Amino acid sequence: MMWQKYAGSRRSMPLGARILFHGVFYAGGFAIVYYLIQKFHSRALYYKLAVEQLQSHPEAQEALGPPLNIHYLKLIDRENFVDIVDAKLKIPVSGSKSEGLLYVHSSRGGPFQRWHLDEVFLELKDGQQIPVFKLSGENGDEVKKE
């Protein structure tokens, strides 16, 4: 008969091996998706603008110490939030002297408009807060707070 298995023919994989294979496959898939989401956020304008502000802020640079390291977002943190018009992030940063979190609040007028920063501040591990950027003025003038 056509469906009969013969000695040496291809047999189905044992259950344990199948579970192991699928576990490795799904874990690898999850890792790739997690990496791609991180990459998506790090290329977004709200993220880039905040990092540029941090890199150009002398007091924050002095507090962290060179070289400045920007770490991956913790995606499971509920305070990291992005929707159509608002983005609120906690970006882990570190340097040779200290480490901390860069708090970012960014917004835009609508889905296809450009992101702009509302507020960026650095909170160091010891609790010190350094204002890096704050949007001020009724007309939306961007003013650094140093």
Swiss-Prot record:
KW DNA repair (keyword) present: no
UniProt membrane topology term: Single-pass membrane protein
Keywords of this entry: Membrane, Mitochondrion, Mitochondrion inner membrane, Transmembrane, Transmembrane helix
Positions on the Mitochondrial matrix side per record topology: 1-14
Residues exposed to the Mitochondrial intermembrane side: 38-146
Keyword Cell inner membrane: no
Residues annotated as transmembrane: 15-37
An example Gene Ontology biological process: mitochondrial cytochrome c oxidase assembly
Any one GO CC term of the record: cytosol
Highest taxon above the source species: Eukaryota
Compartments it resides in: Mitochondrion inner membrane
Pfam families: Coa1
PANTHER family, sorted: CYTOCHROME C OXIDASE ASSEMBLY FACTOR 1 HOMOLOG
Job of this protein: Component of the MITRAC (mitochondrial translation regulation assembly intermediate of cytochrome c oxidase complex) complex, that regulates cytochrome c oxidase assembly. MITRAC complexes regulate both translation of mitochondrial encoded components and assembly of nuclear-encoded components imported in mitochondrion. Required for assembly of mitochondrial respiratory chain complex I and complex IV. As part of the MCIA complex, required for efficient assembly of the mitochondrial complex I.
Quaternary data: Component of the MITRAC (mitochondrial translation regulation assembly intermediate of cytochrome c oxidase complex) complex, the core components of this complex being COA3/MITRAC12 and COX14. Interacts with COX17 and COA6. Part of the mitochondrial complex I assembly/MCIA complex that comprises at least the core subunits TMEM126B, NDUFAF1, ECSIT and ACAD9 and complement subunits such as COA1 and TMEM186.
Similarity remark: Belongs to the COA1 family.
Protein name, UniProt field: Cytochrome c oxidase assembly factor 1 homolog
Organism field: Homo sapiens (Human)
Gene designation per UniProt: COA1
